[in-house]
C-alpha cells in the first residue's frame, strides 16, 4: 500500500489523509455492495473514528482482517469490478502506523473488538452481546513520531467526502455533525464546479462500469475530474486520455458529415 508523503496535514496528499481514506474505503465498499447507507466520521485533535453500518466483519475474522496480511474478504465478481482494494492491506497499514488502533465489529447482536499499538495487540476483548446495529467501528490515532505535529484540516476532508457522495449517490456521510449527501451523483459535482451557466443541459451517461457527465460553458480552458474504482485520479491516466480523444473524434466526425 502507498501512504504517500508523511507530512503534517498541511497538504491534501499527506499520509494522515491516506490513513483516513483507507478506513473509509472499506465502509464505501460495504455501501457499494448494498449494505449500510450512512457512515459517521468524528475527528478531534488527535483521533479519528469511522463507523459504518454495513454487515460487520465476521466476528472470528476481526483479528485477521485488522492485523494479518492477505486476509481481505472482497473476492466476488462484483467486488472485483467495484472495490477499491481487495487484499485488505490498507486497514493493516493504518494499524501499524497508529499508536492506538481500536476496531469493533457488530454483527447479528454480538460484537468483537481489539485494541492495538503500532500493529501489536494490546487487548483482545472477548466476544459479547450488543444492541448496536450491524457494522464496523474503527478508531485510530496516527503515530506522531511518524506524522510529526500532524493536524487534520477540515477543508481537505470535506473535499474528499464530497467526491465519495458524488460517486455514490444516496450515501450519507456525517463528518463532525456536518451532513454530506448527493441525490444526482456526478451531475451534482459538475453543477458545483461550474463557474458559469452551461451552454446546454448537462449530458449524463451511466452504464454498469462507467459514468460520464459533460457540458460546456462560455469560457476558455477545460476542466476534468476523473475517477477510477472510486478514487480521484488527480494526474489523469489512460482512461481520461481515451475519453478526451473519443469525445474530440466524435464531434469532428459529426461535423464532417453531410446531414439533411
Which residue stretches match the model-derived regions?
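Conserved beta-strand-loop-beta-strand hairpin that lines the nucleotide-binding pocket
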Residues: 28-75
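Flexible hinge/switch segments at interdomain interfaces of large molecular machines
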Residues: 1-9, 43, 129-139, 212-229
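Bergerat-fold GHKL ATPase/HATPase_c domain
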Residues: 1-24, 28, 64-66
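Active-site phosphate-binding and catalytic loops of NTP-dependent enzymes
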Residues: 5-9, 27-40, 72-83, 103-104, ...
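GHKL-type ATPase core
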Residues: 49, 53, 60-61, 73-194
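GHKL/Histidine-kinase-like ATPase module
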Residues: 155-158, 162-164, 170-260
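Ordered, soluble secondary-structure elements with a strong preference for glycine-centered loop motifs
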Residues: 6-18, 33, 52-60, 87-91, ...
Amino acid at each position: 500500500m502507498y501512504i504517500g508523503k508523511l507530512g503534517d496535514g498541511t497538504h491534501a496528499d499527506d499520509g494522515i489523509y491516506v490513513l483516513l481514506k483507507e478506513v473509509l474505503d472499506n465502509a464505501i465498499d460495504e455501501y457499494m455492495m448494498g449494505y449500510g447507507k450512512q457512515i459517521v466520521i468524528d475527528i478531534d485533535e488527535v483521533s479519528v473514528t469511522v463507523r459504518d453500518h454495513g454487515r460487520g466483519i465476521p466476528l472470528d475474522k476481526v483479528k485477521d482482517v485488522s492485523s494479518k496480511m492477505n486476509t481481505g474478504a472482497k473476492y466476488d465478481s462484483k467486488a472485483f469490478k467495484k472495490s477499491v482494494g481487495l487484499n485488505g492491506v490498507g486497514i493493516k497499514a493504518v494499524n501499524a502506523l497508529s499508536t492506538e488502533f481500536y476496531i469493533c465489529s457488530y454483527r447479528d447482536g454480538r460484537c468483537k473488538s481489539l485494541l492495538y499499538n503500532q500493529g501489536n495487540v494490546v487487548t483482545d476483548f472477548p466476544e459479547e452481546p450488543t444492541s448496536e446495529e450491524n457494522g464496523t467501528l474503527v478508531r485510530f490515532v496516527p503515530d506522531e513520531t511518524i506524522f510529526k505535529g500532524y493536524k487534520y484540516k477540515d477543508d481537505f476532508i470535506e473535499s474528499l467526502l464530497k467526491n465519495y457522495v458524488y460517486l455514490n449517490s444516496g450515501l450519507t456521510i456525517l463528518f463532525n455533525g456536518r451532513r454530506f449527501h448527493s441525490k444526482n451523483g456526478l451531475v451534482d459535482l459538475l453543477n458545483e464546479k461550474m463557474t458559469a451557466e452551461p451552454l446546454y443541459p448537462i449530458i449524463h451517461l451511466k452504464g454498469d462500469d462507467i459514468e460520464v457527465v459533460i457540458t460546456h460553458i462560455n469560457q476558455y480552458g477545460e476542466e476534468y475530474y476523473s475517477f477510477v474504482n472510486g478514487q480521484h485520479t488527480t494526474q489523469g491516466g489512460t482512461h481520461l486520455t481515451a475519453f478526451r480523444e473519443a469525445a474530440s473524434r466524435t464531434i469532428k466526425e459529426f461535423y464532417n458529415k453531410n446531414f439533411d
